[in-house]
């Protein structure tokens, strides 16, 4: 089976049974189709099983990968689908490129307005609400409002009263001089309802139901009860499309197994037009990691600042405000909080997919290690041991080792190391110390040696490890280095005396195994480092300076990166990031003692 088909098959197994939208992409990573589904897994699987018509067969033949976004309802999926189609204009979405395919409810712009269901939007002729998933949904909503409000029904004003007046569904403006303020109040209540504010209409119906019941008019009370239930069933909170046109970005995140996923929803003109997904290996607490991310998001990544930024309530608003120069909102309830929760839920789904795909791929690990051995020109590495260091500015340096046997993690043979002999942030010396300690003990206790050692790093790390193994311990074990790109993703495997790149295809099983190993050793190392920091506390020269607490210390480290950079900074540099002048002077003096 071709590699892309295998990847698609693997990913289909971890798609959730939830509503949402999906994006099909071709070999050039272009979006060629956008769709929605009540159950994402079932819909996506249907594309890759069974027979299809000619158009769908052509579409499936071009698909090389897919993405999906989870929503809270089928209606949200529709609204998001429309926004995504407008954004990407996929060539296979011919039938969905125009909003006219979907019905809207319209309040006409007349002296005595009418309620209409229409598929044509003409600006200046009235207010439009929607779109609705289908005509039935729009018609049911209109019928409900017709039963509650005696709005005008006739297209042209007749000369005499019609049936609607006699059954109480029209005030008869064709004959009577209807109070315009009363009509305007009805229009306001209908508008509020169509914008998702159903509390007013529900309260009114509940009062009518109670009055009818007290008057022993049980038939009328039952009718009001049925209307209330109908509204509750029909009303579907539409978080993806809002009548609020404020430009805002919505942030949500999830943390698991040493990784953090942050999702950003870009809301423009009430629509979610785009999202951004970022995976980050946790180096600090989740809160500190988020502050660092959001500060860089609008500076390094040059995203345009919106009018509002919405973030979870567990975060420190002042910390975020110090690095993001716009209004920070932490919604406590309602649709805005729902949107933050939805971003967090999508982040959780993304993390789950990452880990589930890893676990499902364990059945192919034997092939992976065979392929790895062939490409490196060594015997099949049955036992692989991988190392990674973790520290912040040289504080509490630690290292960790993970063991993979037959391409699968062997957790009982994982090891943790506190760096003992190295002062300051020196990755090379730290790696030499840990390798020396590990394999001295292996030799002394007669433990099994690995077939391959992998270090998280490049040529410098590899040479240091090889020197310790060969010249100090007399061991000849293959040593390889794994490097990452600027997105923290495994990018290349280095091997040999000159640390040459091993020609592995990025979509090969061997490369994916290396990605798993690097992720796992990194997770294990930073988890151990966080545990160590929690016990000892993060100590630095900043701890002894008056006016510098944890928040300002984090702000300084995030802004300057190191004590050395702070010593090079001016008073103005400190003031520019929000440090008060008196504290900045004290800080400057202490750093230059």
UniProtKB/Swiss-Prot annotation:
User: Record's InterPro entries?
Assistant: GIY-YIG_endonuc, GIY-YIG_endonuc_sf, GIY-YIG_UvrC_Cho, RuvA_2-like, UVR_dom, UVR_dom_sf, UvrABC_protein_C, UvrC
Q: Which CDD domains match?
A: GIY-YIG_UvrC_Cho
State the Pfam families in the record: GIY-YIG, UVR, UvrC_RNaseH, UvrC_RNaseH_dom
Q: Does the keyword Ribonucleoprotein apply?
A: no
Q: Which UniProt keywords apply?
A: Cytoplasm, DNA damage, DNA excision, DNA repair, Excision nuclease, SOS response
Compartment list:
Cytoplasm
Question: Carries keyword Oxidoreductase?
Answer: no
Q: For the GIY-YIG domain, which residue ranges apply?
A: 17-94
Task: Give GO MF terms, alphabetically.
Answer: DNA binding; excinuclease ABC activity
Sorted alphabetically, the Gene Ontology cellular component annotations on this record are: cytoplasm; excinuclease repair complex
Q: Which GO terms describe its biological process?
A: nucleotide-excision repair; SOS response
- Entries under PANTHER family matching the protein: UVRABC SYSTEM PROTEIN C, UVRC/OXIDOREDUCTASE
Family designation: Belongs to the UvrC family.
Cited function: The UvrABC repair system catalyzes the recognition and processing of DNA lesions. UvrC both incises the 5' and 3' sides of the lesion. The N-terminal half is responsible for the 3' incision and the C-terminal half is responsible for the 5' incision.
**HAMAP family in UniProt:** UvrC (MF_00203)
**Protein name (Swiss-Prot/TrEMBL):** UvrABC system protein C
The record lists the lineage as: Bacteria, Bacillati, Bacillota, Bacilli, Bacillales
């Amino acid at each position: 089976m071709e590699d892309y088909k295998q990847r698609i098959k693997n990913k289909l197994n971890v798609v959730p049974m939830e509503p949402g939208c999906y994006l099909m992409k071709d070999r050039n990573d272009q979006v060629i189709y956008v769709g929605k589904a009540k159950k994402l897994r079932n819909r996506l699987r249907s594309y890759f099983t069974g027979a299809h018509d000619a158009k769908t067969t052509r579409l499936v033949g071009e698909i090389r990968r897919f993405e999906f976004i989870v929503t809270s309802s089928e209606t949200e999926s529709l609204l998001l689908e429309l926004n995504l189609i407008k954004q990407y204009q996929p060539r296979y979405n011919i039938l969905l490129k125009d909003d006219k395919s979907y019905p809207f409810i319209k309040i006409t712009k007349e002296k005595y307005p009418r309620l209409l269901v229409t598929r044509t939007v003409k600006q200046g002729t009235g207010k439009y609400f929607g779109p609705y998933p289908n005509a039935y949904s729009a018609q049911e909503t209109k019928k409900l409002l017709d039963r509650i409000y005696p709005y005008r029904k006739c297209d042209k004003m007749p000369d005499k009263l019609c049936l609607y007046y006699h059954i109480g569904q029209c005030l008869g403006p064709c004959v009577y001089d209807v109070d315009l303020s009363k009509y305007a109040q009805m229009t306001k209540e209908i508008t509020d309802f169509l914008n998702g504010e159903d509390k007013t209409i529900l309260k009114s119906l509940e009062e009518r139901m109670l009055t009818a019941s007290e008057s022993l008019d049980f038939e009328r009370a039952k009718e009001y009860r049925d209307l209330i239930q109908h509204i509750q069933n029909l009303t579907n909170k539409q978080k993806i499309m809002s009548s609020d046109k404020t430009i805002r970005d919505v942030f949500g995140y999830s943390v698991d197994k040493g990784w953090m996923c942050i999702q950003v929803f870009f809301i423009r003109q009430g629509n979610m037009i785009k999202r951004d997904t970022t995976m980050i290996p946790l180096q600090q607490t989740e809160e500190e990691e988020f502050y660092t991310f959001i500060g860089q998001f609008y500076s390094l990544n040059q995203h345009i600042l919106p009018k509002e930024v919405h973030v979870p309530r567990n975060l420190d608003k002042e910390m975020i405000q110090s690095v993001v120069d716009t209004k920070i909102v932490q919604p406590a309830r309602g649709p805005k909080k729902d949107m933050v929760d939805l971003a967090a839920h999508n982040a959780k789904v993304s993390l789950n997919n990452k880990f589930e795909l890893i676990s499902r791929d364990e059945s192919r690990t034997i092939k992976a290690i065979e392929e790895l051995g062939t490409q490196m020109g060594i015997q099949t590495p049955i036992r692989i041991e991988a190392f990674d260091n973790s520290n912040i500015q040289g504080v509490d340096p630690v290292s960790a080792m993970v063991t993979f046997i037959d391409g699968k993690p062997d957790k009982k043979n994982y090891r943790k190391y506190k760096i003992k002999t190295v002062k300051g942030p020196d990755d090379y010396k730290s790696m030499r110390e840990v390798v020396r300690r590990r394999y001295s003990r292996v030799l002394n206790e007669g433990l099994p040696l690995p077939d391959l050692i992998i270090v998280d790093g490049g040529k410098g790390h590899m040479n240091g490890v090889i020197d310790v193994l060969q010249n100090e311990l007399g061991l000849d074990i293959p040593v390889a280095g794994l490097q990452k790109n600027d997105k923290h993703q495994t990018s290349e495997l280095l091997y040999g005396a000159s640390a040459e790149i091993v020609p592995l295809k990025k979509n090969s099983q061997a490369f994916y195994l290396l990605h798993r190993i690097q992720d796992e050793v990194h997770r294990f190392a930073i988890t151990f480092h966080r545990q160590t920091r929690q016990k000892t506390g993060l100590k630095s020269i900043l701890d002894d300076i008056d006016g510098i607490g944890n928040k300002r210390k984090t702000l300084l480290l995030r802004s300057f990166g190191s004590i050395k950079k702070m010593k090079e900074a001016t008073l103005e540099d400190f003031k520019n990031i929000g440090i008060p002048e008196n504290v900045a002077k004290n800080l400057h003096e202490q750093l230059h003692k």
